[in-house]
Amino acid sequence: MKKKSFKICTTIIFFLFSIQSAFCENLITPKPKPNLAKEKKDKYISGIIIPKFKPGTYVSEDQLELLKELEKEKEIVVKRVDGIIIPKNKPLIVHKKRLSTTKKSKYYSDRDLNYARQAVAFMEKSNWKDALKVAKKARAKSIYNFIQWRHLLTPGNRATFYDYKSFIESVQTYPRLSRVKYLAEHKLSTKNQSPKEIIKWFEKHPYTSGFGEMVLGESLIKSGNKQKGIQLIKKGFIRADLTKSDLINFRKKFKKYLTSEDYVKRADHLAWENKHWDLKRMLRYLPKDYQLLYTARQILMSNSYGVDTAISKVPAKLKNDAGLNYNRLKWRVKRGRLDSSLDILFNIKNTKEYMVRPDKWWGERSKIARKLIYKKRYEEAYKVTSKNALSKGPELAEAEWLSGWIALSFLNDPILAKDHFIKFYENVSYPISLSRGAYWLGRTYEKLKDKENSKKWYVIGSKYLTTYYGQLSHMKAKPREKFELSELMQIDKNYAESFYRNKIVATVHLLDELNKDKYTKHILRYLANDNIDKGSEVLAAKLATDIGRFDFAIQVSKIASYQKRFHNKYNYPIISTPNYINGRKIPESALILSIIRQESEFDLKANSHAGAKGLMQLIPYTAKL
């Protein structure tokens, strides 16, 4: 019985073990991959697998031809070298010749265009050595001239005086050449050039800076003309733009020629020009009393701490110094201290001799007067504007108009206003100002019940229809008549041909082709002045428009309009504007275009420091619809 039971158990265990082994084998041991038929293997090796046709599918002649070709491929014997399968040679790929999309330059060869592109790239990285080296390889010398021009105008460059001289003499005439000559003067030195060479240079190119004046003075002294040399050194020292090292150098050189009075005059010049850093460097060289005076002025100018202490240290004899009073006034106006500002203005001498620079004082007077108007203190405002000690310049014109406006609009005194507006009209020349003066004279005579003179001045103002006051004058003089702008001036055809042959015109096109038209601004302004009577302004504005720089065309036309030459086609560009955006009706085109012209001059890339962007100079948040 026991034996029988043992056999049964053994049989069951063996059976279970067999099932488990089979089960594990199926789970763990992967099934062997099926053997592929030789034909199918050849297909895989050859890289060709012929798909089977679906039953009932019609086979076209093209498909049969394809099948035959595939069958031939199938028969290719796969080579073996030392047991390694060598794949079939890949079919040759025929490359289609790409059509060149590079635009040809209008004036330059492909080779020169490439050199120009490289040179400008180096230039924008301030790698002047390589920029000039590459530019010199070009056959067109205008490429090198442009790169060298940009180099010489760059502050802190390493160019020598001879680099400047070579450029000036080779081009004869070029944009901003007066600036290049000014910078050339600052490269002169009796250490590197002989007195004779310097004198000869200034005989041909008169000095334009205080620095050049001093260098010439030194050369004259070394050549024996001591009196004239000392005179030039003293005069140049007052107004020269000097670095810290320049100041130390010239002070050592001219120690026996420069007096303490010369140092005071230079300090005064720097203070009136608001150059407080340069003034600070000068303080140590001043006499004690003047050192205290100009220390106080420097602290007031730079908005530094210790204003009251510095002013208290100024000697009594210098307390009423015009420059000190001016700086104190400016400091108070900036902080909104109206009444204490008036204390200064009403207690100084309103004479040119005392005020030294009445034009500087006017800037603060204007601000004070407008604040007084807001506070309805009209008589004080008139007093501030009318007693100004000015005798000429744009400041005088502004002072006369503001005085006349206050007299007419707030003091109700047209007779007093008339005198101011006439003086304003006689001291201006730009159409925008002439129309303004004429309109307000018309208004003044209208208030005086003098219809004849009123209409006369409105008619005069209506001559300038591109200005705001010109249009207001027209509405007064000819209320029922439409006004028309003058037509574009005629261009001399022969001159136009010579204009476009100008190498500098070629440079403008080159920069446009390189997408660097931002560098054309001063070039276009220069071209505009080439021959105004024959139409250079119009041609320059047209050229600017052709390269897509409406802003530069407007600038050229604006400058022309100041001299009563109106190129309205280019001064007021017209571009299409949508009627609706996102289902919302937008303002009429005339309003949009006028805003664009005023805000960005149609410069697509215009960005303001305040964050305004685009043609209309809108803040992104404001621009959202």
Where are these regions (language model features)?
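Classical Sec-dependent N-terminal signal peptides that target proteins to the secretory pathway
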Residues: 2-25
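Proline-rich, low-complexity linker regions of envelope-associated factors in Gram-negative bacteria
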Residues: 24-106, 527
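Solenoid-like repeat scaffolds
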Residues: 102-108, 132-142, 153-156, 165-176, ...
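TPR repeat positional signature
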Residues: 115, 148, 181-184, 213, ...
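Structural register within alpha-helical repeat arrays
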Residues: 118, 148-151, 184, 216, ...
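Residue at a conserved register position within TPR or TPR-like alpha-solenoid repeats
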Residues: 122, 155, 188, 220, ...
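Structural motif corresponding to the intra-repeat A-B loop/turn of tetratricopeptide repeats
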Residues: 125, 154, 191-192, 223, ...
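Catalytic glycan-binding domains that act on GlcNAc-containing polysaccharides
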Residues: 142, 149-151, 162-170, 182, ...
